[in-house]
């Protein structure tokens, strides 16, 4: 892959939105929630026990925060082959992912997915494009937004890309309904926080059966597969990051947005398992907005899983940090 010179994509003033001609309604099933939680190793009771989820203020069994990324991937991968020119099977490299959360998905949700192609850049031997998918519940409420950055070799978009007013409207309609931790005893007061404060680290030991199971889960029924950076799919790493932050903040809905750029390394070959150490650090606090920015680093066998990763967290959701209290 070469950096090359970017050929700018001309943005035309089209009469219609450049929303992809694709919409799908997905039913969030409890068995899928439990399976997803099992594969990423998230044992929070809200993902397995409806009563525990209701006790935390959810309407039913709560999906892990990045469960929605599976819906995003499936929506993107079903529409992209209809928009790309080129011979042979479509192969994509997933390099970046962001997820903005209004609320967590719960069992019984019927979610509509609308896919928007936001940008495309042509290089000498590949095309880079950003795809944003809007998740809307049956009441018409925008509950989550996800943006993926993908690289494609040998395929180009058939159409030019235009800014979509509908996408900007959807962004404006996303209002995080944040949940404070059920147990407030661990909360950290705003005046005790500052840039540089570290969260306790956590060690995750991935199982190859879970990596393989995750691949099957997210690719089941798709017309083609995507090449993920490293041995573990990017979205699995995304799930591990959310698992780590959820364990640190004590509530699965504490984080309102996740951002990650995936590296090209995770676990070694099929005969070995390498521990992954996650660490978090407060990098900024917006007092007026009541939000903190957290940088996340994950290292396996001396190599990083992310080029960079971060999250936004309401300060009321951040617990007191004790460097001597790692979680496994």
Set out the residue ranges of the language-model regions:
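Beta-strand-rich interaction surfaces with strong enrichment in secreted/lumenal proteins
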Residues: 101-103, 228, 263-264, 268
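Hot-dog-fold acyl-thioester-processing enzymes
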Residues: 2-94, 157-256, 320-328
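Residues that form or immediately flank small-molecule/cofactor binding pockets and catalytic motifs
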Residues: 153, 204-206, 265, 287
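A conserved acidic, glycine/proline-rich C-terminal tail/linker
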Residues: 257-262
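Short, proline-centered helix/strand-breaking motifs
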Residues: 104, 250-254, 265
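HotDog/MaoC-like acyl-thioester-processing domains
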Residues: 2-21, 94-195, 270-328
């Amino acid at each position: 892959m070469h950096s090359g010179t970017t050929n700018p994509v001309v943005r035309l003033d089209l009469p219609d939105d450049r929303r992809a001609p694709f919409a799908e309604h997905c039913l969030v099933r409890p068995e899928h929630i439990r399976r997803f939680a099992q594969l990423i190793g998230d044992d929070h009771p809200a993902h397995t026990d409806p009563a525990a989820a209701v006790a935390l203020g959810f309407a039913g069994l709560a999906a892990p925060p990045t469960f929605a990324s599976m819906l995003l991937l499936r929506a993107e991968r079903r529409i992209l082959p209809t928009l790309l020119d080129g011979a042979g099977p479509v192969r994509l490299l997933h390099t970046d992912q962001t997820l903005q959360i209004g609320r967590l998905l719960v069992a019984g949700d019927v979610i509509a997915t609308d896919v928007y192609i936001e940008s495309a850049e042509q290089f000498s031997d590949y095309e880079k494009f950003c795809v944003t998918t809007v998740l809307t519940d049956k009441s018409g409420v925008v509950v989550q937004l996800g943006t993926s950055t993908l690289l494609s070799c040998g395929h180009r978009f058939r159409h030019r890309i235009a800014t979509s007013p509908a996408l900007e409207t959807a962004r404006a309609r996303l209002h995080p309904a944040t949940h404070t931790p059920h147990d407030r005893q661990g909360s950290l007061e705003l005046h005790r926080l500052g840039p540089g404060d570290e969260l306790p680290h956590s060690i995750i030991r991935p199982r190859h059966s879970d990596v393989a199971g995750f691949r099957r889960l997210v690719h089941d029924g798709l017309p083609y597969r995507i090449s993920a950076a490293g041995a573990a799919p990017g979205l699995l790493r995304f799930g591990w990051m959310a698992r780590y932050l959820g364990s640190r903040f004590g509530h699965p809905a504490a984080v309102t947005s996740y951002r990650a750029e995936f590296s090209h390394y995770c676990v070694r070959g099929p005969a070995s398992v390498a521990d992954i150490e996650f660490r978090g650090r407060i990098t900024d606090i917006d007092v007026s907005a009541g939000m903190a920015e957290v940088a996340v680093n994950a290292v396996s066998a001396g190599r990083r899983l992310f080029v960079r990763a971060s999250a936004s967290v309401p300060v009321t959701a951040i617990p007191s940090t004790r460097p001597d209290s790692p979680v496994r």
